[in-house]
Curated annotation (Swiss-Prot):
Its EC number is 5.4.99.18. Keywords: Isomerase, Purine biosynthesis. This is N5-carboxyaminoimidazole ribonucleotide mutase. Belongs to the AIR carboxylase family. Class I subfamily. GO terms for biological process: 'de novo' IMP biosynthetic process. Catalyzes the conversion of N5-carboxyaminoimidazole ribonucleotide (N5-CAIR) to 4-carboxy-5-aminoimidazole ribonucleotide (CAIR). Pathway: Purine metabolism; IMP biosynthesis via de novo pathway; 5-amino-1-(5-phospho-D-ribosyl)imidazole-4-carboxylate from 5-amino-1-(5-phospho-D-ribosyl)imidazole (N5-CAIR route): step 2/2. Substrate binds at S9, D12, R39. The gene is purE. One of its GO terms (molecular function) is 5-(carboxyamino)imidazole ribonucleotide mutase activity. NCBIfam families: purE (TIGR01162). HAMAP family: PurE_classI. It holds the Pfam family AIRC.
Length: 161
């Protein structure tokens, strides 16, 4: 495994699966797990503190509401932690964004956008991080970026379909 995708509850999976799909696109191995900062704090501590020895290189943590999962995961590991604020009914995920982005100096969490775009970009960013030491992954990331450019250039007029 290279990437761990964790989320506060199973209800976060529809959002977090976009991170998994992005990693699939680049052929990056990952594991998924529900780990609640509030309901299973000891499991979270064990998961994050053993992540490096289990072969993980990056952790993607998605959470809604109080969204303490990414910050607490970062507190227990020296690996990069990417935080995804999951969009919620209350406050549309803005509360989660503030929770994840406002980390104290010395405990870093790379915070992505709220919701599906954030989850997909977390997968992309994890692949880019891994790609700095894996030419195969980086080649796939670069091909993806080229495909995006080509799709825009192929359809420059929004009035045409």
């Amino acid at each position: 495994m290279k990437v761990g995708i964790i989320m506060g509850s199973k209800s976060d999976w529809p959002t977090m699966k976009l991170a998994a799909e992005m990693l699939d696109r680049f052929g990056v191995e990952y594991e998924t797990k529900v780990v609640s900062a509030h309901r299973t704090p000891h499991l979270l501590a064990e998961y994050a503190s053993t992540a490096k020895e289990r072969g993980l290189k990056v952790i993607i943590a998605g959470a809604g509401g109080a969204a303490h999962l990414p910050g607490m995961a970062a507190a227990f590991t020296s690996l990069p932690v990417l935080g995804v604020p999951v969009q919620s009914r209350a406050l549309s995920g803005l509360d989660s964004l503030y929770s994840i982005v406002q980390m104290p100096k010395g405990i870093a969490v790379g915070t992505l956008a709220i919701g599906e775009a954030g989850a997909a970009n977390a997968g992309l960013l994890a692949a880019q991080i891994l790609g700095t030491h894996d030419e195969n992954i980086m080649a796939k990331v670069e091909a993806f970026r080229s495909e995006q450019t080509e799709s825009v250039l192929a359809n420059p007029n929004p009035a045409e379909d």
